[in-house]
Design a protein with these regions (language model features):
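Conserved class I S-adenosyl-L-methionine
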Residues: 8, 47-98, 114, 118, 201-226, ...
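N-terminal, positively charged/glycine-rich alpha-helical extensions of SAM-dependent methyltransferases
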Residues: 25-72, 282-292
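Class I SAM-dependent methyltransferase SAM/SAH-binding core
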Residues: 104-162
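A short acidic, Gly/Pro-enriched loop at the edge of an enzyme's catalytic core
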Residues: 161-172
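A short SAM/SAH-binding and catalytic strip from SAM-dependent methyltransferases
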Residues: 171-184
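A short glycine-rich, Lys/Arg-flanked "PGG" loop and its adjoining helix->strand segment in the class I
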Residues: 186-198
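Short alpha-helix
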Residues: 225-245, 256
């Protein structure tokens, strides 16, 4: 997928309708007149809403200010957590995506590209990786660092709750480190799942101290120092059309990573199927009615 093909694959993040590419290739316009700009380095500004919700705007500002020192700060956090092996753990995350050469992957919240580099390695040769972030400065830094040898790489500024792609576009989607602060988290999970083909993988993680550690002295200190570690794993936000859900605690059990496989539809339960071997009708529905 070259740059022109990437632009042609983008849809309106609000409506999902097609976009018209200007002759000079510098803008994309929706049917209702909303314009999205293509930057000089090819980064497409697909942010929606144009004026971000307060929480998302705050995160964008913070990351834009911290982009040069961000990697050192994150590595320090992981080092404090049971002296975790950051490189090995990040590789473990990407392995969960089950990528192969030639596949197409999306990373939401790519940051400076640490995990992105591992994703690129997995789909080489011939694969396509699309990287997005809220922060222009973070994404520009990733673009400067990452090698495009034997792989197609495309970048866009985007809100993970409004992805500019058609259904079933990717083989896998990855996000780590920001879902706790998403203003529309449930919608984000719906979007991350929607753009993955049936059978593909979604891998998501962030801060959340494991329940069995929260009352221990050391972790109680951690919870006071950074309220984000108090976040609960957002299992309730996961869509219905998934299977093989797994949850792992990592980085000293202070972060989680979840993985699941996308299905074409939600599972079904036949609550009216009669229980065999009885001389009277019995099923789940009747048992529920009796329990009321």
């Amino acid at each position: 997928m070259d740059h022109k093909e990437f632009l042609e694959s983008l849809v309106c993040p609000r409506t999902g309708s097609s976009l018209t590419i200007a002759e000079d290739g510098n803008t994309l316009t929706s049917n209702d007149g909303v314009t999205y700009e293509v930057g000089e380095t090819g980064i497409v500004n697909m942010l929606y809403p144009k004026e971000l919700l307060p929480g998302d705007a705050r995160e964008q500002y913070l990351y834009d200010q911290a982009f040069l020192r961000y990697d050192k700060g994150v590595s320090w956090v992981f080092e404090t957590l049971n002296h975790s092996d950051e490189a090995a753990t990040r590789q473990y995350f990407i392995d969960l995506m089950e990528l192969k050469p030639g596949m197409k992957a999306l990373e939401v919240g790519a940051g400076t590209g640490k995990d992105s580099a591992l994703i690129l390695d997995k789909v080489r040769p011939g694969g396509t990786v699309v990287l997005s972030d809220l922060s222009p400065n973070m994404l520009k830094l990733a673009q400067e660092k990452l090698s495009t040898e034997d792989v197609n790489v495309h970048y866009f500024l985007g809100n993970g709750s409004y992805l500019p792609f058609a259904d079933d576009t990717f083989d896998a989607v990855f996000h780590f480190g920001g879902i706790n602060t998403f203003s529309e988290r449930k919608r984000a999970f719906d979007e991350l799942t929607r753009v993955v083909r049936p059978g593909g993988k979604v891998v998501v993680g962030d801060e959340s101290v494991a329940p069995w550690l929260r009352n221990t002295p050391t972790y109680a200190t951690l919870l006071k120092a950074n309220p984000l570690f108090r976040a609960e794993v957002p299992i309730e936000d996961v869509p219905a059309n998934i299977e093989n859900f797994k949850l792992h605690y990592v980085f000293g059990n202070a972060f989680y990573i979840m993985e699941y496989r996308v299905t074409a539809k939600a599972p079904e339960v036949d609550i009216d199927l009669p229980i065999p071997g009885k001389d009277f009708v019995d099923n789940w529905r009747l048992r529920a009615e009796k329990a009321e």
